[in-house]
């Protein structure tokens, strides 16, 4: 079977399966990235807290999650949550092992790992703020929320976008690791197809091309966002 027929949309083609798997990859990566952004904001906020306990918690979190291999984190979340569900089920008379939802546990595991990196990105963005503009806003009589919305947030977002874009690329690549817990995303579908047809190169080449396509499109989106955030700023001569 030729490559075009193999990856076609006919009865013997795998094109539809690969496209569905690509959609699943985008969905799980987007979910994990969003989870990471939320927890990253919390981590960055904790790192600037006056409470030494919160500062220590944020530092310990980022150190631990960046130090443990991502695959191990996925296994811990998947089997840990499955054991918890099975234990709860046994209390109500259910016997046997109950698997946790692969999408949910995978997205949560990757999201919390990415949060460790996003915490550092967001913390660096806040440290790069123009303190003079913040002091001027306070002198003008701005309240905290107005100051945050008009001065702090736009500047922090501008500084954070490049780093956040890099974290997105990391999350996209890490989404392939979720294949080990059975979620049929792009990498898993390539494994299934290559095993069924004994043409692994064709499937892995197609998967690589689709990953690159997602990377290119998302990279363009982040570049447009960066360009938009820079509008109205004077460039140094």
UniProtKB/Swiss-Prot annotation:
Membrane topology: Multi-pass membrane protein
Coiled coil: none
ABC transmembrane type-1 domain location: 22-222
Cellular compartments annotated: Cell inner membrane
Gene3D superfamilies: MetI-like (1.10.3720.10)
GO cellular component annotations of the record: ATP-binding cassette (ABC) transporter complex
GO molecular function: transmembrane transporter activity
Keywords: Cell inner membrane, Cell membrane, Membrane, Transmembrane, Transmembrane helix, Transport
Transmembrane segments: 24-44, 72-92, 96-116, 201-221
Entry similarity comment: Belongs to the binding-protein-dependent transport system permease family. HisMQ subfamily.
UniProt function note: Component of the octopine active transport system probably consisting of four subunits: Q, M, P and T.
NCBIfam families: HEQRo_perm_3TM
Matching PANTHER family: ARGININE ABC TRANSPORTER PERMEASE PROTEIN ARTQ, CATIONIC AMINO ACID TRANSPORTER, MEMBRANE COMPONENT
The name this protein goes by in its record: Octopine transport system permease protein OccQ
Source organism of the structure: Rhizobium meliloti
Gene: occQ
């Amino acid at each position: 079977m030729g490559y075009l027929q193999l990856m076609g949309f006919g009865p013997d083609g795998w094109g539809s399966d690969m496209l569905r798997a690509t959609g699943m990859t985008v969905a799980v990566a987007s979910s994990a990235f969003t989870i990471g952004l939320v927890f990253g904001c919390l981590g960055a906020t904790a790192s600037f807290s006056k409470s030494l306990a919160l500062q220590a918690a944020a530092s310990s979190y980022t150190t631990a999650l960046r130090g443990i291999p991502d695959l191990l984190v996925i296994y811990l979340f998947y089997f840990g949550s499955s054991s918890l569900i099975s234990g709860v089920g046994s209390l109500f008379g259910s016997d046997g092992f109950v698997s946790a939802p692969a999408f949910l546990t995978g997205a949560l595991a990757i999201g919390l790992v990415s949060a460790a990196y996003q915490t550092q990105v967001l913390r660096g963005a806040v440290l790069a703020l123009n303190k003079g503009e913040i002091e001027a806003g306070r002198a003008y009589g701005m309240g905290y929320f107005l100051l945050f919305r008009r001065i702090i947030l736009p500047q922090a977002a501008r500084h954070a976008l490049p780093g956040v874009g890099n974290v997105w690329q990391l999350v996209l690549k890490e989404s392939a690791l979720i294949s080990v817990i059975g979620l049929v995303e792009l990498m898993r579908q390539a494994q299934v197809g290559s095993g069924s047809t004994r043409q692994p190169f064709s499937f892995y080449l197609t998967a690589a091309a689709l990953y690159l396509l997602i990377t290119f499109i998302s990279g363009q989106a982040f570049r447009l966002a960066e360009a938009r955030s820079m509008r109205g700023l004077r460039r140094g001569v």
